[in-house]
Swiss-Prot record:
It is found in: Cytoplasm. Homodimer. Heterotetramer of two MnmE and two MnmG subunits. The lineage of its organism: Bacteria, Pseudomonadati, Pseudomonadota, Betaproteobacteria, Nitrosomonadales. SUPFAM superfamilies: FAD/NAD(P)-binding domain (SSF51905). Belongs to the MnmG family. This is tRNA uridine 5-carboxymethylaminomethyl modification enzyme MnmG. GO terms for cellular component: cytosol. GO terms for molecular function: flavin adenine dinucleotide binding. The gene is mnmG.
């Protein structure tokens, strides 16, 4: 019997990073093996049943633009879709979807099993095979060895995973799945800097025991958004609502009383948790002035009664979990189906990675996902795709690729990781990107699909649809530039009827569209204007492109100014809490590090471009006040004289 053991690329781990890595490598023609501990958990959502959100939705769109699976899978599995920040500018609008966990796993597995060049095997990897600091393959728990020219590790929270519930702890990669202990030991023997991080999940609740009568309903958006550029609403399953409730003072008293047995506060948990997804006990302690916190009740699927109570992640004892859940309005008789828990795991300093996500120490070994100190399905999937791409390019002896910070949130993510490192689980926000006005969800394909096609990540069907869209936008922009509206017609535009602007000259449609408040639809409705044949989504992107043109250029100039301020000296012992607008995280980190210059401040993990802008404003105000005071002193001196 012949069983192939020789591959171009081996991917270890079948989560969000691993599935994207394996698909990317196989799409590029590499003979690929995906090894996973359990075939039934491919694409598993280990924590919250959702995809997208602020910054994260942008990453999903970029994955889709590069031919990845996540966006298309959530379009087939999403049971509620919303556009966050819909009242704000296009740059910070973000798509978010609740997922049916089972449908999502099925959508991912369907794509894996249909992908040419890709084999999947259920087996646990215990060892990495090396020859002179070069990866040559892996060995499994059954003693089977597989050779490869590149290996991508996407092991999530499984390396040395230790789960905590109250005073109890046990080895696990997540509840119900064993930790990777031998592989963790093997990696610790290598020339890699290792640390511990922590994440957590809330207890699950049986919806049949929830009283929804007095809870606030949160339906999805109409019209329903889609994630994939090739998606349509006909792919969506039945849509459902989420619900909202709040903790209360009784809840907080129960939590405070249970802290004596909280592994977070007894020192049993050493790993640092995600700042922007704190446990409920962390919220109660850190924000003691708050008398309540929001809890979102999110369905886990269409064929299950389980509910995910987003906002009460906890590692308190099971008894305390029951008490705290039942103290919340609507949950007085709630039955917990699975207890919440925290989990600690190994990660490796991402500053030891190249921008390709290949380790500097071991040739051919790539890391992607939580092993690099990130948190979130979307961050993991984006890294996985990039690692799979670069592993393939390495085998082809081609130059590695990573988008720059002005090309993609993926570029921001990787640059932050490999230059700044992490001190806590890293998640993506739009505020991390200095070029966020041009890194929008709507134009992710315009930024990345051509590159994806050149690498072989994007198939011909997607390429033809994209090329037609791009041509339609450019053709319509040209038409807007050459089409002029004569004087005396502007009064027909509803937006300008109350405007003081003169109507005594002609304007091109392009000029008019750049004005705030004038929509593309309104412009082309003028009887003097030839009608357009482009569809709604293309029209929306065209309008955003035109209106944002000037803002994008100004943002570029601002980034250049920031670079010029690299050597600007910061005052010694500056109390950063006096700088208006800084977040608690930024204030805390700046006070702790006390950087000497703006450049040093900008390179601290977690310090965003927006924070640097606020710092510069603060310094300029201080200099202006000092100059005014000196002038005042000078004038008073002249008066005395």
């Amino acid at each position: 019997m012949h069983f192939s053991r020789d591959f171009d690329i081996i991917v270890v781990g079948g989560g969000h990073a691993g599935t994207e890595a394996a698909l990317a490598a196989a799409r590029m023609g590499q003979k690929t093996l995906l090894l996973t501990q359990n075939l039934d958990t491919l694409g598993q959502m280990s924590c919250n049943p959702s995809i997208g959100g602020i910054g994260k939705g942008h990453l999903v769109k970029e994955i889709d633009a590069l031919g990845g699976a996540m966006a298309a899978a959530i379009d087939e599995a999403g049971i509620q879709f919303r556009t966050l920040n819909s009242s704000k500018g296009p740059a910070v609008r973000a798509t978010r979807a609740q997922a049916d966990r089972v449908l999502y796993r099925q959508a991912i597995r369907k794509r894996l099993e249909a992908q040419p060049n890709l084999l999947i095997l259920q087996s646990t990897v215990d060892d990495l095979l090396l020859l002179d600091d070069k990866i040559t393959g892996v060995a499994t728990h059954l003693g089977i060895t597989f050779s490869a020219r590149a290996v991508v590790l996407t092991v999530g929270t499984f390396l040395g995973g230790l789960a905590h519930v109250g005073d109890r702890n046990f080895q696990a990669g997540r509840a119900g799945d064993p930790a990777s202990i031998r592989l963790a030991h093997r990696l610790r023997e290598m020339n890699l800097s290792v640390g511990r991080l922590k994440t957590g999940t809330p207890p699950r609740i049986d919806a049949r025991t929830i009283d929804f009568q007095f809870l606030r309903e949160q339906p999805g958006d109409e019209p329903i958004p889609t994630f994939s550029f090739l998606g349509n609403t006909a792919q969506h399953p039945r849509q459902v609502s989420c619900w909202m409730t709040r903790t209360n003072e009784k809840t907080h008293e129960i939590i405070r009383a249970g802290l004596d047995h909280s592994p977070l506060y007894t020192g049993k948990i050493e790993g640092i948790g995600p700042r922007y997804c704190p446990s409920i006990e962390d919220k109660v302690v850190r924000f003691s002035d708050r008398d309540s916190h929001t809890v979102f009740l999110e369905p886990e699927g269409l064929e299950t009664s389980e509910i995910y109570p987003n906002g009460i992640s906890t590692s308190l004892s099971f008894e305390v979990q029951v008490e705290l859940v039942r103290s919340i309005a609507g949950l007085e008789n709630a039955h917990i189906t699975r207890p919440g828990y925290a989990i600690e795991y190994d990660y490796f300093d991402p500053r030891a990675l190249k921008r390709s996500l290949e380790t500097k120490a071991i040739d051919g070994l790539f890391f992607a996902g939580q092993i690099n100190g990130t948190t979130g399905y979307e961050e993991a999937a984006a890294q996985g795709l990039l690692a799979g791409l670069n592993a393939s390019l390495k085998i082809k002896e081609q130059e590695s690729w990573c988008p720059s910070r002005d090309e993609a949130y993926l570029g921001v993510l990787v640059d932050d990781l490999v230059t700044r490192g992490v001190t806590e689980p890293y998640r993506m926000f739009t505020s991390r990107a200095e070029f966020r006005l041009q890194l929008r969800e709507d134009n992710a394909d315009m930024r990345l699909t051509e590159a994806g096609h050149q690498f072989g990540l994007v198939d011909e069907k997607r390429w033809q649809i994209f090329a037609a869209k791009r041509e339609a936008i450019e053709t319509e922009k040209a038409r807007l530039r050459r089409t002029w509206v004569p004087a005396g017609v502007l009064h027909k535009l509803q937006t300008l009827q109350t405007s003081d602007q003169s109507d005594d000259r002609s304007y091109s449609l392009y000029e008019l569209l750049r004005r705030p408040g004038i929509s593309y639809t309104e412009l082309v409705s003028l009887s003097e204007v030839e009608s357009s044949m482009i569809d709604g989504r293309i029209a929306q992107q065209l309008e955003i492109d035109v209106k944002y043109e000037g803002y994008v250029e100004r943002q570029r100039q601002e980034v250049v100014r920031h670079t010029q301020h690299e050597t600007m000296v910061l005052p010694k012992n500056l109390d950063y809490s006096t700088v208006r607008g800084l977040s608690n995280e930024v204030t805390q980190k700046l006070n702790q590090h006390q950087p000497e210059t703006i450049g040093q401040a900008a390179r601290i993990s977690g310090i965003t471009p927006a924070a640097i802008s606020l710092l510069l404003v603060h310094l300029k105000r201080g200099m202006a006040r000092q100059a005014a005071k000196q002038e005042e002193t000078h004038e008073s001196g002249k008066t005395v004289a």
